[in-house]
Each structure stands twice: as structure tokens, then as C-alpha cells.
UniProtKB/Swiss-Prot annotation:
SMART domains: CUE, PlsC
Chain ranges on the Cytoplasmic side, renumbered to this chain: 1-32, 54-390
Organism: Caenorhabditis elegans
Keywords: Endoplasmic reticulum, Lipid droplet, Membrane
Annotated compartments: Endoplasmic reticulum membrane; Lipid droplet
Protein name, entry field: Lipid droplet-regulating VLDL assembly factor AUP1 homolog
Membrane topology recorded in Swiss-Prot or TrEMBL: Peripheral membrane protein
Lineage: Eukaryota, Metazoa, Ecdysozoa, Nematoda, Chromadorea
Predominant location category: endoplasmic reticulum
Protein family (similarity comment): Belongs to the AUP1 family.
Length: 390
């Protein structure tokens, strides 16, 4: 019988790092149409909830974090804001570290409403803002050793548990988990895994987060859509076995959490996810520049301009025939569009387009025959020039 680790690795062999994230907010056509119709209503709901959200924030700051009144009040107010938090499983008070998967920007809020906890801050932000949002400065920006040391000190003087997201980045939670960071398992040998699931009803089934999105964009959809259900499930606590290494304990917790979510544990780490986000952001910026360039650049109209453009493109794509490039330029009247067609394989690399070079009695084809012979001659002489030293 195959081990869970072997089965998990087999399931993730074909996974790309991009597969662990949502690429688009909404990929369903019917849902997109419904979203357009719903937009005016959504904006009104958004404005009302922004006003209510400010009051919720004030309540969260004024009431003591561990008070039962705060938990019940926040849970009711969050439901009005469209953030419905559901709980399953039993919270084991002997576990001082909660280890959860990360699927949205409000995961820590959902867990904190059910179990007041401490969340390490990974940003260098002012103390007042950190206090308002419930973060604690454990020196994460100053290195792992500082983070682990200060986390251990915090647990000795605080009654509330420490909440950690060992993935380090928000994923879709549908394909696989990011490989866990081991720091929180070094803080305590007893941890309680917490699985977090997010659900939205159809046709408002909009992704809670996409790769490279900003926090305020994610929050916009939380407030604009009717409601979002965040389910928090407490799994049985797990203890580090005798003679079990830190990496083995981390992997075992990850496998347990992945098994509860019915997904696998990927081979990718936080650095791979960060690089994927950078690539996506770069591709989006490049695509925007291309669109702007397409709108602002004049269309090729003069045959002489198209001839010069064809020669420039030929230098970058030497395997394509000049006549094929020139013919596509006549259709697109755009250098960028023709280059994209070449990359997409929409243009044949040969010169043939139905013109054999034979002069027919139809005067309408004479121009095409002339152009075909001209570009054929240019191509032949160009090849001779390129091969002159060989």
C-alpha cells in the first residue's frame, strides 16, 4: 500500500506553481453577466458596509481582545458586513500555537472572532496601527531566530495562543498547500491545525483572492457581494514525536491539514510563489503597455513603411519568410499585432500563399505575382549575403 507522502507527491507532479492560485476573479460567463447587472446594487451595499465597517473597527479597538462580549459583538457585526463565520471542531486550550492554511485576507479575523489570538506582524508598521489590527511585533523583519525567540517569550507571558500561517501567502486552497515554513513548529512542540474554507453562493462565486491582487481589492469584493461564508474547523492537536525532526513534524502537520481539505501538499515554497506573483505582475504590466502602444501608435498605411517594418521584424524572426510577414502587415497594419501573430504561430513560415509566380490573364493577380517575386528575390539575396562567409 502506497504511503500518503507517495500519493501526495504523485498528485502534485503535474502541478505548476500558478495552479495553486486563482488567476481570475470570475471565469463563468453567466456569472460575469450577472455581476454586471448586480453592480449598481453592489455599490450601494459597499457604501453602507464601509460605514458600518468603520464602527466595527472602533468596537474591535475599544473592547478587550479576550472578552466574550467582543467575540459575540464582532461575529454579529461581521455577519451584517457579509462575513459569516462558522465553527466546527473543538478548540484544545493546551495547544498554544494554531496552524492554519491561508485562503483570504480575513482568515485571521475569522479565527480571532472564535478564538482570540495573537498574529505576528511581518510588516514594519507603526505601533498604533499594529495594535488596532491585533498584530504583535515579533521581529519577523529581523530574521528567523529573532522571530522564534520572541514568539516563545510571548507565549510565556500571554494566555492567548499564537496564530500562524506557515504557507506565508494566500492560495486558492483547492489544489495543494504551499510547503510549510518550519518556524511556528519550532516555537512549540504542540500545535493545533486549523482548516479554513471560504464559500460564496452562485452566481456570486467570485474568487476571494487572485495571484498578485491587492488587499483592498479583495476587501472590496467582501463588502460588495451579498455574503461570504468562512468556515473554521479545529482539528485534533498534534505533538512532536520523540526523535522526530522539525522538518518531519512540519511535513506531518501539513499532510494532516491537506488531508482534511482533500488536497495535497505541493513541492513549492514561498519563494516560488513570490516569483510567480512577480512574473504575473510583470506580464500584466507588459500587456497594458502593449494595449496603450496599440492605441497610441499610428497604423501603417504607407507601403514603404510596411516594407521597412517587415525587414525589422525579419531580423527578430529569421525563420519566417519576408513575404509572409509582409502579407500579414497588410492585413493588420500593426507591427505589434504581426509580432504577436508570429509568436502565436498564426503565420506560416513559408512564402506560399497561393501565388505560384505564373502570370495569368487575370490582371487583378498581376500585383500579387509581382510582390511575391520581389520578396522572393529579396529573401534569396538576403540568404546569400548572410552565408557569404560560410
Amino acid at each position: 500500500m502506497a504511503s500518503p507522502e507517495a500519493s501526495s507527491s504523485g498528485n502534485t507532479e503535474d502541478l505548476r506553481i500558478e495552479d495553486l492560485f486563482h488567476q481570475k476573479r470570475n471565469e463563468d460567463t453567466i456569472a460575469k453577466i450577472f455581476s454586471i447587472i448586480y453592480a449598481p446594487v453592489g455599490l450601494i451595499i459597499l457604501l453602507i458596509r464601509v460605514f458600518l465597517g468603520f464602527h466595527t473597527f472602533i468596537v474591535a479597538c475599544l473592547l478587550r481582545k479576550s472578552a466574550a462580549l467582543r467575540m459575540h459583538t464582532l461575529r454579529i457585526m461581521c455577519s451584517i458586513l457579509g462575513i459569516v463565520v462558522e465553527k466546527s471542531g473543538h478548540r484544545d486550550e493546551s495547544a498554544r500555537v494554531l496552524c492554519a492554511n491561508h485562503v483570504s485576507i480575513l482568515d485571521h479575523l475569522a479565527v480571532d472572532i472564535l478564538t482570540p489570538c495573537l498574529l505576528p506582524s511581518v510588516w514594519d508598521i507603526p505601533s498604533i496601527i499594529r495594535w488596532c489590527f491585533g498584530y504583535v511585533d515579533l521581529g519577523a523583519t529581523r530574521g528567523r531566530d529573532q522571530l522564534v525567540s520572541r514568539a516563545k517569550q510571548l507565549l510565556t507571558r500571554e494566555q492567548m495562543p499564537l496564530l500562524a500561517f506557515p504557507e506565508g501567502i494566500i492560495t486558492s486552497g483547492e489544489k495543494a498547500l504551499i510547503k510549510f515554513n518550519t518556524w511556528c513548529f519550532e516555537v512549540s512542540s504542540v500545535v493545533q491545525p486549523v482548516s479554513v474554507r471560504v464559500w460564496r453562493p452562485y452566481p456570486w462565486k467570485v474568487s476571494v483572492s487572485v495571484l498578485g491582487s491587492s488587499w483592498w481589492t479583495d476587501l472590496f469584493y467582501f463588502f460588495a457581494l451579498p455574503f461570504t461564508v468562512i468556515t473554521v474547523e479545529y482539528l485534533p492537536k498534534m505533538e512532536r514525536r520523540e526523535n522526530e525532526s522539525l522538518e518531519e513534524f512540519t511535513a506531518r502537520v501539513a499532510e494532516t491539514l491537506a488531508g482534511n481539505l482533500k488536497i495535497a501538499v505541493s513541492k513549492f515554497g514561498i519563494s516560488d510563489a513570490t516569483e510567480a506573483a512577480k512574473r504575473l505582475r510583470t506580464d500584466r504590466e507588459r500587456a497594458k503597455k502593449v494595449v496603450v502602444r496599440e492605441k497610441t501608435s499610428p497604423r501603417l498605411a504607407d507601403p514603404r513603411q510596411m516594407d521597412e517594418c517587415a525587414m525589422r521584424i525579419k531580423q527578430s524572426f529569421p525563420s519566417f519568410h519576408l513575404s509572409a510577414i509582409r502579407r500579414d502587415l497588410e492585413k493588420t497594419r500593426s507591427q505589434t499585432t504581426t509580432v504577436n501573430n508570429l509568436k502565436a504561430g498564426k503565420i506560416s513560415s513559408s512564402a506560399s500563399d497561393g501565388q505560384t509566380g505564373k502570370v495569368t490573364l487575370d490582371a487583378g493577380t498581376w500585383r500579387g505575382v509581382f510582390d511575391n517575386r520581389k520578396w522572393q528575390m529579396i529573401e534569396v539575396n538576403r540568404q546569400k549575403y548572410m552565408n557569404r562567409d560560410s
